[in-house]
From Swiss-Prot:
MF GO annotations: 1-acylglycerol-3-phosphate O-acyltransferase activity; acyltransferase activity
Tissue: Widely expressed with highest expression in heart, liver and 12.5 dpc aorta-gonad-mesonephros and lower levels in the 16 dpc fetal liver and adult bone marrow. In bone marrow, highest levels are found in B-cells compared with whole bone marrow, T-cells, erythrocytes, and granulocytes.
Pathway field: Phospholipid metabolism; CDP-diacylglycerol biosynthesis; CDP-diacylglycerol from sn-glycerol 3-phosphate: step 2/3
Top-level taxonomy: Eukaryota, Metazoa, Chordata, Craniata, Vertebrata
Protein's UniProt name: Lysocardiolipin acyltransferase 1
Glycosylation: residue positions: N35
Statement: the UniProt record of this protein carries the keyword Lipid biosynthesis: yes
Topology relative to the membrane: Multi-pass membrane protein
UniProt comment concerning the protein's domains: The HXXXXD motif is essential for acyltransferase activity and may constitute the binding site for the phosphate moiety of the glycerol-3-phosphate.
Length: 376
């Protein structure tokens, strides 16, 4: 049964992303055609203000407890984040970790392309220059090249989240993963899926070539009690009681240099995840970490609490104010309608705002294709 908590959570997030896209991100879009550096600097910070909202709601309103062990992030460092894909919404729960240990404004996510069409959420993700993929390497490789080369060219300090497993852990997906393991003489997994390493190795190599990689962060996520597998579970009010993250930081210069060794390195991390998660779920449901973190959290819990409270207050007032302005003033209503039409049409015609941003960079810097010099 749908719960009021779930409805409140989804509607609040939708309203924030919808009105935020139109009234906060919409006015800065022309800056894309004038100064891309300023556009990216401003848009990243505006989007990050919304990313604090689900963190605030989950922890402050619904009592979700977050436990983080292991390493943190060097402030401002550029990294690739690899994580097991336990549920379809792990990418959102990760914000609870990054809000404490890193900066939300530098995160980029590889997501399935259908999400960019979702009103509000998808529009903001396009402005944030998330990387949308079709999960077919022959279709995704060129887009990966363009986006990563663009980030390297503008010296964007990104932290790129990749799910090497490619999909979330369900019984059907686990059966397919184990069939693959049996055919290839590999270990069968219970708590993770076998990773697909092609995209991971490509991204790491490309970022290293562009001198835009400081580390790889290997994050293991676990849910000791209830596991909200899909967005539907959130709508039903099935929020996780606890989310545990274990972070391991690997400096870029410690990674293997060859593609084959990097693939093997990734597979070893997943073998470790399987054992770590087995100990977690069959034991005390904690990640046992006896060593010391090499990097401490960059924010205190008091600072995080203040940000969460301010986020809820700001977005509640902002959404209410925008509704009032739309009701009272016809110019605002016209702007509202025109903006919606623009966001819908630009995606259908051009493929998304991140594609337009790439085209602007090519035009302003006279680069017909960002990857033309590196293509095989």
């Amino acid at each position: 049964m749908v719960s009021w908590k779930g409805i409140y959570f989804i509607l609040f997030l939708f309203a924030g992303s919808f009105f935020g896209s139109i009234f906060m991100l919409g006015p800065i879009l022309p800056l894309m055609f004038i100064n891309l550096s300023w556009y990216r600097w401003i848009s990243s910070r505006l989007v990050a203000t919304w990313l604090t909202l689900p963190v605030a709601l989950l922890e402050t309103m619904f009592g979700v407890r977050v436990v983080i062990t292991g390493d943190a992030f060097v402030p401002g460092e550029r990294s690739v984040i690899i994580m097991n894909h336990r549920t379809r919404v792990d990418w959102m729960f990760l914000w609870n970790c990054l809000m404490r240990y890193s900066y939300l404004r530098v995160e980029k996510i590889c997501l399935k392309s259908s999400l960019k069409s979702v009103p509000g959420f998808g529009w903001a993700m396009q402005v944030a220059a998330f990387i949308f993929i079709h999960r077919k390497w022959k279709d995704d490789k060129s887009h990966f090249e363009d986006m990563i080369d663009y980030f390297c060219a503008i010296h964007e300090p990104l932290q790129l989240l990749i799910f090497p497993e490619g999909t979330d852990l369900t019984e059907n997906n686990k059966a397919r993963s184990n069939d693959f393991a049996e055919k290839n003489g590999l270990q069968k997994y219970e708590y993770v899926l076998h990773p697909r390493t092609t995209g991971f190795t490509f991204v790491v190599d490309r970022l290293r070539e562009g001198k835009n990689l400081d580390a790889v962060h290997d994050i293991t996520v676990a849910y000791p009690y209830n596991i909200p597998q899909t967005e539907k579970h959130l709508l039903l009010g099935d929020f996780p009681k606890e989310i545990h993250f274990h972070v391991q930081r690997y400096p870029a210069d410690s990674l293997p240099t060859s593609k084959e060794d990097l693939q093997l390195w990734c597979h070893r991390r997943w073998e470790e995840k399987e054992e770590r998660l087995r100990s977690f779920y069959q034991g005390e449901k904690n990640f046992h970490f006896t060593g010391q973190s090499t990097v401490p959290p960059c924010k205190s819990e008091l600072r995080v609490l203040v940000v969460k409270l301010l986020s809820i207050v700001y977005w509640a007032l902002f959404c209410s104010a925008m509704c009032l302005l739309i009701y009272l003033y016809s110019p605002v209503r016209w702007y509202f309608i025109i903006s919606i039409v623009f966001f819908v049409l630009q995606e259908r015609i051009f493929g998304g705002l991140e594609i337009i941003e790439l085209a602007c960079y090519r035009f302003l810097h006279k680069h017909p294709h960002l990857n033309s010099k590196k293509n095989e």
